[in-house]
Amino acid sequence: MTAAQRRSAIYDQLTAAQTPISATALARQFSVTRQVVVGDIALLRAEGHSITATPRGYMIPAETGLRRTIACHHSGEDTQKELFAMVDCGCTVVDVIVEHPVYGQLTAPLALSSRYDVEQFIHRMKTSHAQPISALTGGVHLHTLSCPSEAVFAHLKATLANMGMLYDAD
């Protein structure tokens, strides 16, 4: 298999996948190193393919649902509650965004669609002793969401407001 054929096969795998695929799994499948897969992904992106790196692996972002952005504010301890509220309302948490004073906007892909996804994300945060990216901004952050409808987004905003997590600049 040539490198170009491998890249095409990797893209086909990602397109067909319902969940993210790790670079390690792709490396095993194609009998190459993880670094080769990372390079292949970079080349596929350079060709114009939309490939997202999530904490669970690579994926092709689904273009379903309404894209909405919501501003939130809470402590790191409340991250799981916030994310559960979002997925329980039927939304996919696409990413988290913070505004850094030097780097500007920092965006981290999440792709969380279920309680299981959230639990896995929180587990990785705890076992790696990592702080949420919102720790850089005192808990203020944005989420890009994919929502099934405007009604669901409105319900989520009301839910987060009741939880005291919806950011209000006042």
Name these PLM-found stretches.
Residues 1-29:
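Extreme N-terminal segment that seeds HTH/winged-HTH DNA-binding domains in transcriptional regulators
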Residues 41-42:
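Short, hydrophobic-biased segments on the C-terminal half of alpha helices
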Residues 48:
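Conserved functional loop/turn residues at catalytic and ligand-binding sites
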Residues 51-62:
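Minor-groove-contacting beta-hairpin "wing" of winged helix-turn-helix DNA-binding domains
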Residues 65-170:
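Mid-protein regulatory/catalytic core that forms ligand/cofactor-binding pockets
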